[in-house]
Amino acid sequence: GIITPEHSSMTWNGDAFPFPSWEADQDLNSAMQNSVNWYFQAIDSQLGINRVQEFLNKIEYGNQTTSSNLDLYWSDFSLKISPLEQVTLLKKFNTNEFHLNFQNVFSVKNAIKIASTPNGNFYGKTGTGRVNGQDINGWFIGYVETSDNSYYFATNIQSDSNATGKKAFEITSDILKKLHIWN
């Protein structure tokens, strides 16, 4: 692989980015926490379009469609996935039905862990689709593990503006609280 649990650091090249958190060296945890596109684009670039496509096919990620530009397929809306497909994929990832390296799965789970209490663990990842400076597509996917169950979710909000991953997170958190799954 391009990165390993022990070696996931990448050096920022000094380019200006829209978010200050992107203008720093990154590792898997910081890149996941801040959705640092350049970090994941660098991995994709090193993998190449064929290996990226093979992986999307292996994990049956949505429509498995990539544009020919590795820098854009996440943001040009050629790659599409439904909330139900997100939940199915996340459950298969969490139970390692894809037969990935256990340490890599563990590293990703650690990178998306939001909170831990004696009652369980809360995992999730936000995402925001921005077009022409407007946040039009907000995602929050994740799961809660308790001693006796796992609860998977995917929240997607769409609007002409202000549809962010943060808002999807807030909606999901309210629902989980009302259902007494996570406080």
What are these regions (language model features)?
Residues 8-21, 30:
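Acidic helix-start/capping segments at beta-turn-to-alpha-helix junctions
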Residues 20-24, 28, 40-95:
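Mid-domain, small-residue-enriched loop/turn segments at the edges of structured enzyme/sensor domains
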Residues 12-13, 74, 139:
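Tryptophan-centric aromatic hotspots in well-structured domains and transmembrane helices
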Residues 28-35:
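Short helix- or helix-capping micro-motifs
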Residues 5-12, 43-44, 64-70, 97-105:
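Surface-exposed patches in mature extracellular/periplasmic domains of secreted proteins
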